[in-house]
Amino acid sequence: MVTALLALAAVTLTLFGVWHLPETATHPFAPWLTLAGAALGVYAFWRIERDWPPPEEPREERMRTQGTRRKAALALFWGGFFVTLAALWAIWRQPFAWNQALTWAAGLILMAVGASQITGWRADRFDEPGPKPDPVYLGHKLGVARVQNAGEQAKPATRRPQRTGASLTARLNLLYYPRPKPWQEALLVVIILSIAMWFRLNHIGQMPPGVFIDETNAALDALHTLEGRADSLFGVGWYETPNGFIYLQTLFFRLLGTTFAAVKLQSILPGVLTVLALCFLAREMYGPYPALLTATFLAFNRWHVNMSRWGWNEVYPPLMQVLSLFFIMRAARRRSLGDWAVAGLVLGLGMYTYLSIRMAVLVIFIYLGYRALVDKSFLRRNWQGVALFALMYAVTFAPLGFTYAKNPFTLLNRTRQVSIMNDVQAADSLQPLLESTKRHLLMFDVAGDRNPRHNLPGKPMLDPITGAFFLLGAAWSLWRWRDHRRGLVIIWVGITLLGGILSRLGEAPQAYRTLAAAPAVALMAADAYNLTWRAVLLPGRRYRFWRWGTTLLMLAGLAAAGWLNYVAYFDEQARSPDVYLAFTPLENEVARDVLAREGSEQLYLSPRLYYFSPVRFFTYRPTHPVGVNLGPIHYSPFDRLGGGLAAPAYQMAEPANDLPLPATGKDATFLLDLDYQYLMDYFHYFYPNAAGEVVRDRLGDPLYFRVHIPADDIAAAVGRRYEGGGLLGRYYHGEDWQGEPFMTRIDPFLLFAWPEEEPTPGPFSVTWTGDLLAPTDGAYHFRLDADDGVRFWVDGAVAGESLEPDRPNTVELTLNLTAGPHPIRIDYFQRGGGKAMRFYWTPPGRPTQPVGPEHLQGHP
């Protein structure tokens, strides 16, 4: 009973302290309660392991195959190895050829299969030297009496072996802590996976509140690949994302098209699979009950749930790391070369997912070295397996490594961009590094990631229940650091946190790059939860009602933790304005607007909106059939073809030159920047019934301006010429306003963001001249945004200029003007890169707006 009371006291103190850790200003005792609870928990866990040690998994052995089978296995392995080497040589010389990639994959498979056959069926588990276990019979066994035949000599009676303390402990373990039957364990795993799926699918259309542009930016890379762009499987793409992930995306798009489901499932599926893989890993480490607890903690973990609901690649490194560790643990237990080979293969394939997998590689190799130090027999028993693991990892990672070797920029560029060394150099001090370390250590229970896409800003990454048991598990793991299982989770969390600690201080704490720590957190929390369960069960384990009551109490604790995560994510986080705004509501609303009108109306989008990746992705229609072809089976998720990425179902809007529109019998809709709400008079010049509307988000903030034009107005205005106000523009080849203009026209207003081929390829320059019609006397503020340079003349004198090439330039000034016309001139040049020119003013008593045609008069 003492152990049970100590464990309950430890949990109570830790839980109470963790609950108030975010409010240490008003609850200064919280850190001390937490520390006291953790220390008391270590003592309680030590007592329970002393008084009632957990049942240990029997060690299995794999026999070395002999004879022909062994020779065939070795031939298969070494044949695969040399095939892989030949493929790597070909990939080094020609990385874009698919036949080399297929040969490389075939060689890896041959190596893994051959290694798995070198060790055969399981040997007797008690072949290890040492004392044999005393046979224990649970329950009553009925003896069958046999009548002795005549002449048969009676056998001498054998004395029943005396039970040892170890055998009695084993008997009690099985009587009062029985292993679940296989069907029971499978049923519980299915229930836990169902919970994990529910947390990751529930209200997926509303939370996150939109598709973030990172999701669709990478998806566009995959669409370019589908369209035939020559991308090596072993190269890198957007933000140095390995192309392996890009090619995986193409599979989703072949099956599901460019749909919302295709984006989300590529992270939901690995998120759920991580829960399953972690269950297997925890079972290898601690047994069935801790495995079920571990999977449950990860199933509803808000940190992992939030990231799993992105359509992005950050969920893959935790999955690959957990799988690799599972095969390593099983390989060490069974001495199976096949498991060692698969572990290296999985970790190597993980390198093709997301950059944070590099931390997983460090975790695993440091763990292997650490285990060799604390377990003297580990390398003696497994040196061949460890060598095979390293070899399989090396040959799997090698093609991507070739890319990094040939172009080191692709290896280190992103790392340098986000490195905390930028802050350290700016501060000329290690203080940013120390502060980042502090923030990451406090992210679990005090203050979490402040990025609204990663977390409810500032909220701890763990709920109080998970957080309390995580701290108890962490303290216990530190105390038992010589136990390689506990040492692993300490290494796992510590190394993974470096991915955030070494990032820019402004991002700290960073939940995105440290997501792979979430499974280790679940392992620690489950370890402490299981030990607490055993401690409470110990004093009354002989009584059924006590066992049932304890089990219900622990299930209630899990349910409470799940509920806290549900409320935090689906209520608090879902209602947060910061979270809503972080998921780019403008891009998402424009995409929904285009999808609703696609095919039924002419659609024109201003240049900024035109290039939004969610719009381009969700409205994509391939130029040729895309899907799956398996012999006579042809399947495509796209119901019709289109113009691909080069020619979407909408056009780029340039209202100054687009009007009047061609008559197609359809209405037309312009989706424009908010600046155009001040230019409705220009639309009404051609279309009296045109209607403009400011589209707002759910918070009431303006997003963009929508103009709808009826088909009848379009037909009536065909051929009409514009004779209103504006500035006379003379367009010249070259950037110095020399020679004859290649184009002269009246531009009603200056809101230009030209595509690459307009108004002419290469450098050009423009001079706009005319009169500015000031409506009243007063102070007028002007702003000219140009890319590249611009000079502004008023009343024959230069009022302002900024003429630096190859960069955006802004001219701002305030002038006192009298009512009436004022001669103005704007000189603009473009050398290369972005092409933009915008002319704004702020008249007295009015908001900032483009200078409209009613206030401009051009002179031929």
Where are these regions (language model features)?
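Acidic/polar, compositionally biased interaction segments
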Residues: A715-P860
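Hydrophobic/aromatic-rich transmembrane helices and adjacent perimembrane loops
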Residues: M307-S308, M359, P464, F469, ...
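Membrane-interface transmembrane helices that cradle and orient dolichyl/undecaprenyl
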Residues: M111-F126, G130, V322-V342, G350
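Aromatic/acidic, Gly/Pro-rich catalytic loop(s) in extracytoplasmic/lumenal soluble domains
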Residues: G631-R721, Y732, P860
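Membrane-proximal, lumen/periplasm-facing interface regions of secretory-pathway glyco-
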Residues: M207, P460, T466, R544-E601, ...
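Transmembrane-lumen/periplasm boundary regions of multi-pass, lipid-linked membrane glycan transferases
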Residues: N217-L233, L255, A331, L349-Y352, ...
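Signature aromatic-anchored transmembrane alpha helix within multi-pass, membrane-resident enzymes
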Residues: V190, A390-A394, D527-A568, R720-R721
